Structure formats: structure tokens, C-alpha cells
Amino acid sequence: ARLVHLAGLCGRNVAISSATIPPDLAEGLYRSYQAGLKSYNSFFTGKKQCALVLCDEFRTDVEPMDSGADSAYRKIHDRFIRKRVENLGKEPVKRRGYIQFCGAEDNDTDAAKETSYFENIREAIEKLHENHHVIDKRTKKRISFGVVRVANITPCVKVSLYLMKCGWSEGTAVRVMTYHSRQILLLRHEQERYLDKVFTRKTQSATVDFQDETVRKHLDSTPEENIIFILVATPVEEVGRDHDFDWAVVEPSSYRSIIQLAGRVLR
């Protein structure tokens, strides 16, 4: 809010891009900007007027706003959101989610609960791979790329180790990568550059001719018919990445984290 107020105070424009910003927060930022712009206008004879721009993939609304018109902002924002919900309701459903039941008992040890939790993640991965894989054009193997999102770094590493060591169904092989913010910066830079290349996928075909050298090597050298590429990540995967996965397993921190990660599936 302070930064937005400062932008208004300097007579600059502000663009807010977010899939999950709550209406109250948006209104608070609008008020901060208007307060800054009001101070800016008090210094100059030529006044700047605030223009409200609301846009999504369906439409763009532009409204001139007077200083102090907070109630008008609320009405315009609500109208835009109602129209957006209406348009989304007409779109085909691209993503469906379900809750994976974790059957650990209260009297189990912490180690047993952790193992049960990780095993539920493994079961969910196999189920999602079965329903959302593609066929490699050259080998005819069933391939899927997915992400497992966990809330913190330590369990992120533990999940990765478990998925690499645990038993999988016959004919299934996995390749696991761990992605979190505690990685050495140089290695993280190279990792993100590679992930951006591999997961920026535009094809919608059920049969894919994979071209990446590393992926190709795994497909050609692995005898199993099902190959699952798994990225185990913390919330760093949710923001600022144009990645496209076939499926996701989410340990959510909030509804917003679910929405953010859903935007990385069938992008």
C-alpha cells in the first residue's frame, strides 16, 4: 500500500496483475493510490485524473474515477467480477480436483503418519498419471509431467527422497526433481532456465514427439512403459512461472495457493 501511495504521489501509473487478489485488498490499494494522487494534484495546476482499468481474457473496462469515489469503485469492481464469473461459467471445464484421503490413525507414531502421508501422495500421482498422460510418438510409452506442491522446504526434500526410493507399480518409472528457494543461486538459475524450457508446452495433441535431449534420453533408455516426471516444489512454483503440467498434487496453504497452482495445469 505504501508503494502504491508513493506511485500516486509521484503521478505514476500502477498495474496490478494477480489471479487471487481479494476485492478488499484491491479496494485498499485503490484508496492508497487515490490518496497519493490527491497529494500530487495539490502541487500542480494541471490535474491528473485517475482512470480505473479492469481487464481479463474476456473484456476490458475503463472508467474515469473522481477522488473519494470509493463506493463507485466497489460497484464497478463487483459488476466486473459478476460478468467474469458469468463468462467463466460458459467455458468448458479444463481442471477438476478431488481430495485425497489420508488414512493415518491418531495413535500412529509421527514416522508412521509421515510415511502414510507420503504414500498417499504416491498413490495420487499414479492415479493422475493414469488419467492424464500423453503418448510418446517414437516409443509409444505413456508419459506425464506433474508437480507436487508442499508448503515447506524440509518436507519438500523428504517427499522427493521418498518418491525416489519407494516402490511403484510394475511397469512404472519416475524421475524426480526438487525445486525450492534454498537452492544455491547459480544452480537454481540453471534449474529454472531448464524448467522454463521443458514446461513451456503449447501442443494439445495426445501424442507428442518429445525433442528435449535430457527427456529424450530418459524415454529411450527406460524399459518401463509408464514414465512419470515429477517436480516436487514449494510455493516458489506458484508465482511468475509459465509452466504447464499435466496434473498436480497440492498440499495447500490456502484457497489462493490452490488457485495459483491450478493455473500451472493445462495452461
Residue ranges and their predicted role:
Residues 251:
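A Lys-centered signature of the CheY-like receiver
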Residues 10-13, 172-174, 244-246, 256:
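Short glycine-/polar-rich loops that comprise or flank the Walker A/P-loop
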Residues 215-221, 231-245, 263:
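SF2 helicase motor core recognition
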Residues 255-267:
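Conserved SF2 helicase motif VI
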Residues 38, 100-231:
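Conserved C-terminal RecA-like helicase domain
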Residues 20-23, 152-155, 183-185, 237-239, ...:
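Conserved nucleotide-binding/hydrolysis micro-motifs of P-loop NTPases
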Residues 12-16, 21-30, 36-154:
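Conserved interdomain linker/interface between the two RecA-like ATPase lobes of SF2 helicase motors
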Residues 1-6:
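SF2 helicase catalytic motif II
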